[in-house]
Amino acid sequence: GKLLQEAEISCEIVCGRDFGGASEIRTIVPAEAQEITKEGLYTCLIRNDSPKKRELSQSISDDAFIRGKVPMTKEEIRHVSLGKLHLTEDAVFYDIGSGTGSIAVAAAQLSPNIQVYAMERKAAALELMQQNIEKFHLKNVAVVAGEAPDSMQQLPAPTHAFVGGSGGNLKQILEVVWQKNPLARVAINAISLETIA
């Protein structure tokens, strides 16, 4: 009751106790639940007729992520990059140089059936990425610590890959991706022409 009241959720609770007795079932509101002092086994159904609606968008605002000093792919770039990848329901997706994990999180939220491998070599980024994955309650993201392409060797073949950071190993990373799956679709973000040279 206290948790529901603090969350300011407007709901009713159908509460069952002493089945077979005169007061076996009653309907209460969260504030009344705090007043129940009788110990015993209760069965409750919480009914919320005005739940918060889940947004149907792959776009997550930058403010939603835990940031720190780790680089992050900005919202507009995430949106375009994931759109160009054309992820599918059963995709195996590599996020290489994941940083805060913003791309990994956005991809994983599209479908619980997408398996995301978020690769990062920097300890501070790995910690921040894990916090963001937990914040968004994602079960389909595996954090892979280490330098790509070495960290990719034991992973299943990707159907899609995003390269946000390559540590100077872009050519070798792409070779491993396409060795594992010659048809893998890849998106690369570059802030300098040297990246694609």
PLM feature spans:
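Conserved class I S-adenosyl-L-methionine
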Residues: D90-G99
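S-adenosyl-L-methionine
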Residues: M119-P158
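Conserved S-adenosyl-L-methionine
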Residues: Q109-V116, K180-P182
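Conserved SAM-binding loop of SAM-dependent methyltransferases across substrates and taxa
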Residues: T100-P112
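Conserved alpha-helix/loop element of class I SAM-dependent methyltransferases that forms part
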Residues: M72-D90
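C-terminal substrate-binding/active-site "lid" region of AdoMet-derived donor-dependent transferases
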Residues: L174-A197
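A contiguous loop/helix-start segment that scaffolds small-molecule binding in enzyme catalytic cores
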Residues: K2-K69
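Short beta->alpha hinge that forms the Motif I/post-I loop of the SAM-binding pocket
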Residues: E120-A125, G165-S166, I191
